[in-house]
Structures are given as C-alpha cells and as structure tokens.
C-alpha cells in the first residue's frame, strides 16, 4: 500500500513536561522561601505576585519557580494546542464548517428551543443512513470512501456543536438544583431544631411542676431513730435524685 505524499507527524497524547521541571527541587524551594523572608522578614503571610517575585533579583534557577502571570485575554497553550480564553462557543461558520441546522438555534440568549431535539434526531438518522451508504461504497468501490467519510465527520461535528449549545442551560439548571437542595437541607435543620426546642421546653415545664410540689420550707420529720446523720443522708439522696432527673432529661434530648 502506497503512502500519501503528506505524512502527519506523530505526537504523544500527553507530551513530556518542559525541561525546567528539574529545577523544582526541595533545595530550590527552600532557597525561594529564604529569599522571601530576607526581602520582608515581618510579612510572613504575604501572598507574593509573580511581578513582586521577579523584582527580588532571584538566581536563574529560581526564576523557573515563579509562576507566570495569568492571561487576561487572547489564548493560552495546553498540550501544544492554543486554547481561547473566551467562553463563548464559536459558530461552525466561523470555523469553516458547514452548518446543517438553522442559525436561529445558536442564539444562546433565547435559551434552549424544542427544535434542538428535532435537529439532533435528524442528524442521528442521517448518521445511520450515511454509515449504510459508506458500507455500500466500500463493498463496490472502496476508493470512493473519502467524500462519505467527510459527510459523516460533518454530521458528528454538527451534533456535538448542537449539544454544546445546551451547556449554559445545563449549568444554570444544575446550579438551581444545587441551591434548592441546600435550601431544603437548611429548612430540615431548622425544623429539627424547632422540634428539639419544643421537647426541651416540655421537659423543663415538667421539672418546674415537680419542683413546685416540694415546698422549700419542708423539714424532715424528726423521729426517735432520726438524727443529724440521717438528715444529711436524706439531703444527699434528694440531691442525687435531682441530678438523675437532669441526666435523664439530657439523655431524652439526645435520643430525640
């Protein structure tokens, strides 16, 4: 099988890291922290910006440890590919790809339209039809496969682009659902606190009623068998009973 005139370069899915990763050693990190302390001994919790770190006149091997400035506009490189900072989804026409559905569906401000599902279904059926046509072409004239492969590729791109138009709407719906769950959880916690408060108030009223039945001026009846020792014993027993009531109250509150 003859190879085409143009050969595509082989690139790794995850390219190796830049060579300066070897500069990120514990010794260099300690030297960088030492340079920060020497510059401002009193500012221990300061957040250094890349511009301020570059102003410290660091050694060449320490400059690799300074993070670059965050890009504010334009694009950045990710695994060798340029990525745009703009969150707006570019249209297929801007990317030089044929668009198979009306441009009215790309209006993100109008929100999702029922037509999205209709055109997604049409694209799915077209994919099945084009696949059957591709099988027929490969069985009759395999050399004529490229146009049909391009049609299938275009259909997949349109389907993915149409699905990506749902991303803003999906994000809003996910945020609404998350906030509703947090609100319901907060309401449930408030209801549990109110129920616990009511139970505690009931227990306190019961204790108050029991305390009113006992007069503070009541003294133990002196009998021939009673004496100072027996009086102290009765007092300690009443205190112990009061403590047991309080502990039972706390146990009931915890169980409920």
From Swiss-Prot:
Superkingdom of origin: Eukaryota
Localization: Nucleus
Ranges that cross the membrane: none
SUPFAM superfamilies, A to Z: Mediator hinge subcomplex-like
Residue ranges, compositional bias (Polar residues): 223-242
Keyword hit for Transcription: yes
A Pfam family annotated for this UniProt entry: Med7
MF annotations from Gene Ontology: transcription coregulator activity
Assembly and oligomerization: Component of the Mediator complex.
Task performed by this protein: Component of the Mediator complex, a coactivator involved in the regulated transcription of nearly all RNA polymerase II-dependent genes. Mediator functions as a bridge to convey information from gene-specific regulatory proteins to the basal RNA polymerase II transcription machinery. Mediator is recruited to promoters by direct interactions with regulatory proteins and serves as a scaffold for the assembly of a functional preinitiation complex with RNA polymerase II and the general transcription factors.
Name of the protein described by the UniProt record: Mediator of RNA polymerase II transcription subunit 7
Species: Coccidioides immitis (strain RS)
Gene name, Swiss-Prot/TrEMBL: MED7
